[in-house]
Amino acid sequence: MAEYTGGSIKADHLCVLVHGLWGNPAHMKNVARRLRAEFPEDQLYILVAKKNAGSFTYDGIELGGERVCREIEDQLEEIKSKGGNIKKLSIAGYSLGGLVARYAIGLLYSKGVLDELECQNFTAFASPFLGVRSPLRGFTNQLFNVLGARTLSKSGHQLFTIDQFRETGRPLLAVMADPKSVFMQGLARFKRRTLYTNIINDRTAVHYTTGIAKRDPYADLTKVKVNYLPGYEPVVLDPSNPVTQLPHEEVKKDFQTRARAYAANLPFVLALSVFLPMGVVAFLITSAIQTVRSSKRIELHEKGLAGIDIRTYRSVPLIIKEIRNQIEDAYEELNSRQHQDYLPASQEVSSDSDDEEDNKQPKKEQKQPTVERKPSVRRRRSSAASASHHLPTLALTAEQFEMIDGLDGLGWRKYPVWIHKVRHSHAAIVVRSDKESFSEGEVVLGHWAKEEFLI
């Protein structure tokens, strides 16, 4: 990967890549490779974060963000010491790395580092902005969401939003989506905020959380016509009109269609019934061991004995102008077996600030986008919005609905992605390893580097 990272002292733009849960820098190799193919070393300096790899990702978004922030500061200092002058900053996070990157951005903002840089791109690939809590109700909620939250140490608590972050009394992800937080203020500095979300087969982070959405128009793809982005078919959907509802007579959801689908999935179901129990046991044992190790690392970190002086990161206010008080496969398969629940019609949320706006593409880049919505301004609704009016609202928590409203207030360029060749679309979206079945991820990375990345 060394041939793709780094850069020359002539480069004035630093791009930081952050891997996900259980990940390591090698997972971002093809992301770096695609960037380097588009931008030479004298134009773009590429840093792949290294200090939060493997089981260290169990330690929580906060600790991961502090580690990445330290790496960015160290890299800026190193480049400067060699005679370089970085003027621009871009950050891209994959999976949990998107959340870790957002935390690091908040720290960089609070320390004034972003005041000295032109913030260009923030990109998230399959990042669970709303956590990984499945939209479930009743007993299933207790079984999956409550149990799952306790298998990944501090990261698990934060991803399932059962934590209380410092003295705020709120989950960290909720604080990070508060328009008055340093995390949102920092994110607002970036000229372009882009996300790529898998519409199916992402067993780690499903569409509603990676796409920041209250509804799921891709729950039954037999009922819609998928519209692709010209030049990037059949992988990247057209964000302005991703799907078109099919007339009733064209819906091919008859008995024969279901029977064929079941027959095609039968080998997978049989294999799952054999290997899943063994995988779950191994996963729980590994999680218990890693949770104990993570707790020890967290204790050392909090005492300032892990190589980072946390006082430089903990002395800044989290909220602006307001008091603060106001093994992977087993996990993925468990998550994939949970079907999304929906709110009863009587509890449907208002659609005024809903995902009607989710796929709106900004027509003009703004240097300083405002964080707070202007309630008097009614945004023009896209064709994608009208197509989702009839869809039921997912059974999210009140905090998740607030997170959606807060995050959407920033303005995003959202690209739905359909990976066809492999069930493991979460890994394929960034071509996490050199497999032919992951080749569709090259289309995603190509679109990002060519069409989205501002140099």
What are these model-predicted stretches?
Residues M1-Y4, L21, R34, Q75-I79, ...:
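Eukaryotic intrinsically disordered and solvent-exposed regulatory patches
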Residues A2-G54:
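Short, surface-exposed "cap/lid" segments of acyl-processing enzymes
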Residues H19, G65-P171, K191:
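Serine-dependent carboxylesterase/thioesterase catalytic core
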Residues I46-G54, K82-S90, A213, I298-E302:
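Short amphipathic alpha-helical segments embedded in low-complexity Lys/Glu-rich regions
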